[in-house]
Amino acid sequence: MNIPPCAYAALDTALWDWHAQKAQMPLYQFLGLPSPKTPTSLTIGINPPEVIKERVEIIISNPEVKALKIKLGSPDGIEYDKLIYSQVLDSTKNLDISIRVDANGGWSLEEAKIMMKWLSERKAEYIEQPLVEGDEDKLKYLFEGRSLPIFIDESCRFSEDVSRHYHYIDGVSLKLMKCGGITEAVKILNVAKSHNLKTMIGCM
C-alpha cells in the first residue's frame, strides 16, 4: 500500500502526543528536548518585487521575526531571482535580520554556481536545495569551493538520505509532513548530528 508520508506523519505525531499526555509531559520534554527558544523565521514565496516589498513590510512589523527565507528558482530565470532578492535587501536594509535563500531545486548546476557567488556578496546566510531532487550527484561540484553553506530539503526525505549526501552538504532541512513524522525526524536529526551537520525544522 502506497501511503503518503503526510498520512504517516499524522498517525506518528498522534501516537507521540498520546504517549506524552499519558506521561503528563509536554511533547518536547517527553522527547528529551530543551524548552523551545528558537527565533522565528518566515518564508517569502516567489512574487513580483512590488509584492515582495508589501509582504516584507508586513512580516517585519512582527518583532519576533528574526530571519527571512526567500524562495528563488523562478521559472523566469536567475536575473528575475536577483530582482526579487534585491527588493528584499532594500526592504530590510536598516534592520538586523538574517536572510536565507531556498532555490527549491530551481537552478541548474551553472546557475547555482553563479547565484551562490552573487548571494554570498549580498548578506545571504546559506542556500537551500540549489539543485533539483535527483541531481544530488552534482552537489560535489557546488560543495568544493562553495561561497555559501549548502542545505538540502527535498533531497533529504529520510535518514538514509543524510548518510548518502553528508559529504557534500552543510546541513539539512526537515519537515514532518515530508519525512513521515516525529520518529523519522528524530532519526534524521541524530544522523545529521553524527556527521556534524546543521539542522532546521520547517513546516509545509
Task: Locate each region found by the language model.
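Catalytic core of soluble alpha/beta enzymes
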Residues: L72-M204
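N-terminal capping/lid subdomain adjacent to the active-site entrance of alpha/beta enzymes
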Residues: M1-I99, N104-G106, E110-K113, K117-E121
